[in-house]
Amino acid sequence: MRSYSFWFLTAFLVFATLALGEAVKGGKEKWGNCPAEKGSCIKSGPSQCHADNDCPGDKKCCFLSCSFKCVSPDRIRKEGGNEDEDVSRSSPEPGGEPRPPGSSPSTSILSYYAVSFPPPGIGQMAPVPQGAESWNVGQEASPQKEWS
């Protein structure tokens, strides 16, 4: 009985992990780059999407104004031409690199916060008070007791 339960639980966990992995992967990344952020993030709102396949038509899921939104991608014109060209992989945006194929907005937001933390305008760290040697709150030095 115990081995049956073990194998059943193992099989269930394997299938659940595979199913969740496919759901998180989502579809293909859509053509183009997310538009550049204009302004700073003041208050986050609800996200409209989690991946490009959540957005209708050719819109992309981009992190703008503190949340993910479905927006039309920036399209860069070929030099001397009239057609749009997908340059999202070949030429990075100023100050950053394009998102690699298959990456999700969640990894993009994590890298955004890792690079820009603390957010601009928050202020500086508080100075350490003079004479403060230790920040061990609630721990006072006590004499060593000898155990006999």
UniProtKB/Swiss-Prot annotation:
Sequence segments annotated as region (Disordered): 74-148
InterPro entries cross-referenced by the UniProt entry: Elafin-like_sf, WAP_dom
Protein name listed in UniProt: WAP four-disulfide core domain protein 12
Function: Antibacterial protein. Putative acid-stable proteinase inhibitor.
Disulphide connectivity of cysteines: 34-62, 41-66, 49-61, 55-70
Superkingdom classification of source: Eukaryota
GO cellular component: extracellular region
Organism: Lemur catta (Ring-tailed lemur)
Pfam families linked: WAP
Any GO MF annotation of the entry: serine-type endopeptidase inhibitor activity
Boundaries of every WAP domain copy: 27-74
Keyword tRNA-binding set for record: no
Any one biological process term the GO annotation gives: defense response to bacterium
SUPFAM superfamilies assigned to the protein according to its UniProt record, in alphabetical order: Elafin-like
Signal peptide feature range: 1-23
Compartments in which it is found: Secreted
